[in-house]
C-alpha cells in the first residue's frame, strides 16, 4: 500500500539507507484477463524484437505479450479509458488530471505516452522522497527519453528537498543506474547495437549495470582491481558501474553452485565501482532448484533457517558483513584510487578525496593466519594507531609496517578513531 511504501522509505532514511526504485518506461506489463492491452496510440504489439540493430531493439516488443510503449512518438494522446474509469472509482480522477495539467504546462511537453509515464514515475519522488531509479530495459527505448526522464527526476528531487528540509539526508543529486542488457565496462562510455553506438552516460545515467563483472571476477585480485580502478578513474571518470556476482535474470552467475562464497564477497565488495548484493549472496542461498523453469531457480526462498542454525552459513554471512561494513565506512574502497603496495604478501591501498573530505585504507589478502607483518606504504604515518576492521585488533605503524596477530588471512586497516 501507499502507506507501507511511505513507512519503508522513512524507516530506511532513518538508518541512512537510500532507496532506489525500479522504473519502467518501455512497457506497462503483460496483458492478462485483468489487464487489457493499452490503446494502439499508446502501445504496439508487433513486431517482436530481434536485437540485430538499434531499430529492432527499440521499436518492437521485448518479448511476446509485452506491448511496447510508443516511446518514439511526440503525438498527443488521451488517457486510456480503463485508467480514467479506475481513477474515478477511486475518487482521484480530478486530482490526477490537475497534476497532469500542471506537469505539461510546466514542461511544455506534448501529451505523448512517454511523458505521461515520466510524470507518474517522478510522483514517487514527490510523494515518498525516493533517492534514485534503476531504469529497467534501458536499451529498449530511445536514449533521449532517459535524458528527459533524468531532467524531470532532478527537478522533482530538488523540489522535494525544498519542501521537506527536515528529511534531507545530504546534498547528493538524484541517482540513476541503467539496465542496458549486455553493457560491459570494457565498452567504456558506449553500448554497441551493431549499427549504432549509444552513450547512456550522456543521456541521464550516473552508472550502468556491468554485465561483465561475473566473468572478470575469474581474474586474480590485482588484475581485477587495477583494471577497474584505471577504467573508472580515466575513461569513465565521473560515472560508475554497478557490479554483481549473481542477479535475478542472469542465468550464468559467477558462483552458481555457491562453492566460492568467500571469494565472491571479497571480489565483489573490494572491486572499485558500486556493488549489487543480490539477496542471499551473503548467505549462500541455493541457486540450483530442481524442477524450476527459466530464472525461477535464481529466485528461491531466502535461507533464513540456515542463517539461524548453520555455522557454515553464519561464517559466510559474517565475512560479507565485515567487508560490507568496511566498504560502507570507507568511500575509498569503492570510489578511490587503487594502488598495489606489495605483491607477496598481496597488500594494496585505496585513496579517495573530494573537496574537504579524504579517506584512505590498506588491505591485505591471502595472508598468513596468525602473526603477519605488512607494509602500509605511504598511507599511514609512523606512530599512527590503526585498527584491523576484520579482526578488531589494533596496532601502531612502525617503519612503514604493521604487525597483526589474528586467526584470519586478510586485514582491513583503517586509522583508529
Regions found by a protein language model. Give the residues of each.
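Short Pro-Gly-centered flexible turn/kink motifs
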Residues: 409-415
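Active-site-proximal helices and loops of the catalytic beta/alpha 8
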Residues: 9, 13, 27, 119-237, ...
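Substrate-binding/active-site clefts of carbohydrate-active enzymes
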Residues: 1-128, 149, 153, 178-188, ...
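A structural signal for short, well-ordered beta-strand segments and their strand-loop junctions
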Residues: 20-21, 134-135, 177, 244, ...
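C-terminal substrate/ligand-recognition segments
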Residues: 269-276, 281
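Short, glycine/acidic-rich beta->alpha junctions
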Residues: 1-4, 116, 141, 257-261
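Active-site neighborhood of divalent metal-dependent phosphoester/pyrophosphate hydrolases
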Residues: 245-252
Amino acid at each position: 500500500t501507499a502507506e507501507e511504501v511511505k513507512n519503508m522509505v522513512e524507516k530506511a532514511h532513518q538508518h541512512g539507507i537510500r532507496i532506489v526504485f525500479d522504473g519502467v518506461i518501455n512497457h506497462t506489463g503483460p496483458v492478462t484477463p485483468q489487464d487489457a492491452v493499452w490503446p494502439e496510440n499508446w502501445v504496439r504489439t508487433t513486431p517482436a524484437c530481434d536485437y540485430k540493430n538499434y531499430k529492432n531493439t527499440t521499436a518492437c516488443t521485448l518479448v511476446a505479450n509485452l506491448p511496447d510503449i510508443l516511446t518514439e512518438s511526440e503525438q498527443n494522446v488521451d488517457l486510456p479509458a480503463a485508467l480514467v474509469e479506475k481513477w474515478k472509482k477511486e475518487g482521484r480522477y480530478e486530482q490526477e488530471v490537475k497534476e497532469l495539467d500542471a506537469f505539461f504546462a510546466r514542461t511544455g511537453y506534448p501529451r505523448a505516452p512517454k511523458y505521461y509515464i515520466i510524470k507518474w514515475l517522478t510522483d514517487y519522488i514527490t510523494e515518498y522522497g525516493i533517492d534514485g531509479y534503476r531504469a529497467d530495459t534501458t536499451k529498449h527505448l530511445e536514449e533521449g527519453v532517459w535524458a528527459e526522464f533524468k531532467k524531470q527526476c532532478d527537478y522533482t528531487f530538488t523540489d522535494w528537498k525544498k519542501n521537506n528540509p527536515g528529511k534531507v539526508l545530504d546534498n547528493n543529486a538524484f541517482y540513476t543506474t541503467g539496465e542496458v542488457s549486455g553493457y560491459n565496462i570494457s565498452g567504456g562510455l558506449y553500448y554497441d547495437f551493431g549499427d549504432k553506438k549509444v552513450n547512456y552516460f550522456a543521456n541521464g545515467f550516473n552508472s550502468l549495470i556491468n554485465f561483465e563483472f561475473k566473468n572478470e571476477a575469474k581474474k586474480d585480485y590485482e588484475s581485477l582491481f587495477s583494471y577497474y580502478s584505471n577504467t573508472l578513474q580515466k575513461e569513465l571518470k565521473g560515472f560508475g558501474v554497478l557490479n554483481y556476482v549473481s542477479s535475478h535474470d542472469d542465468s550464468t552467475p559467477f558462483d552458481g553452485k555457491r562453492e566460492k562464497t568467500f571469494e565472491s564477497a571479497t571480489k565483489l565488495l573490494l572491486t572499485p565501482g558500486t556493488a549489487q548484493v543480490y539477496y542471499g549472496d551473503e548467505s549462500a542461498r541455493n541457486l540450483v532448484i530442481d524442477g524450476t523453469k527459466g530464472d525461477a531457480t535464481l529466485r528461491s526462498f531466502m535461507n533464513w533457517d540456515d542463517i539461524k542454525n548453520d555455522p557454515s552459513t553464519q561464517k559466510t554471512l559474517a565475512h560479507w558483513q565485515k567487508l560490507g561494513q568496511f566498504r560502507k565506512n570507507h568511500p575509498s574502497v569503492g570510489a578511490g584510487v587503487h594502488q598495489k603496495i606489495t605483491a607477496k604478501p598481496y597488500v594494496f591501498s585505496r585513496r579517495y578525496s573530494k573537496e574537504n573530505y579524504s579517506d584512505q585504507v590498506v588491505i591485505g589478502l591471502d595472508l598468513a593466519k596468525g602473526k603477519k607483518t605488512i607494509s602500509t606504504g605511504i598511507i599511514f604515518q609512523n606512530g599512527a594507531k590503526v585498527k584491523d576492521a576484520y579482526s578488531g585488533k589494533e596496532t601502531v605503524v612502525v617503519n612503514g609496517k604493521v604487525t597483526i596477530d589474528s586467526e584470519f588471512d586478510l586485514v582491513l586497516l583503517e586509522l583508529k578513531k
